């Protein structure tokens, strides 16, 4: 962290320190739904909740430096309720339009839906997850081995190699797949040292419409890596 921070960020950090002492610490280690709701409402009033959300949804997105300062500060407090301070961000759904914006991004930002990110492939997979595009429908096959929050997410945004019925490569794509889709199964659930939960997921003839592609064909890997980069900045700050 730079030793000389801009005055504006110093003021925000001071405000966050007061928020920890006056709002979060008095609640203690409670982490039930009521306590989480109390922190979220207080965070909205203080303005922290909206710093991870797009302007078009009422957010006031902060700079990478400001978010890093705040995340480091909240993590240093070592209180479980700090994870409820920031509102849900768009994640892999950043800049989507149409159906994906209305039925997935908007509910995520409103806290009505949760999504997971499917990127990592198991070593034992015969080939990376792929989909056949035919007549506007995608038929998906494959596995993802480390999907954080996948057991309870409403949907997963998965990196998939797309081809036509003859096997010609069309490019990679991030595809939104509802967790309860026919053919999607959870093969294993496990936890990591930080207490977060993960699943191994399989796709067997999972069929979704072409309009579930995030962006355009060929943009899948760059979009996935951008999402990973944003998460790594968050984790490093914490």
Region roles according to the model:
Residues 1-83, 103-107:
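Amphipathic, small/basic residue-rich leader segments at the start of a protein or domain
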């Amino acid at each position: 962290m730079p030793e000389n921070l801009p005055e504006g960020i110093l003021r925000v950090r001071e405000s966050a320190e007061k928020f920890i002492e006056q709002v979060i610490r008095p609640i203690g280690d409670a982490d039930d739904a009521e306590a989480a709701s109390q922190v979220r409402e207080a965070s909205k009033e203080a303005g922290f909740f909206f710093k991870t959300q797009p302007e078009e949804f009422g957010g006031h997105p902060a700079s990478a430096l400001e978010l890093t300062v705040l995340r480091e500060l909240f993590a240093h407090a070592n209180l479980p309720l700090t994870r409820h301070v920031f509102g849900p961000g768009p994640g892999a759904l950043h800049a989507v339009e149409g159906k994906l914006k209305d039925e997935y991004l908007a509910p995520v930002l409103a806290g009505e839906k949760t999504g997971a990110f499917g990127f990592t492939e198991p070593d034992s997979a015969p080939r990376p997850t792929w989909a056949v595009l035919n007549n506007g429908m995608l038929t998906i096959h494959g596995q993802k081995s480390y999907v954080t929050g996948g057991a309870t997410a409403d949907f997963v945004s998965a990196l998939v190699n797309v081809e036509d019925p003859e096997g010609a490569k069309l490019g990679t794509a991030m595809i939104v797949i509802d967790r309860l889709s026919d053919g999607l199964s959870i093969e294993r659930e496990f936890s990591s040292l930080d207490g977060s939960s993960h699943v191994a997921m399989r796709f067997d003839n999972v069929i979704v419409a072409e309009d579930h592609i995030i962006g355009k064909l060929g943009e899948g890997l760059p979009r996935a890596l951008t999402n990973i980069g944003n998460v790594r900045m968050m984790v490093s700050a914490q």
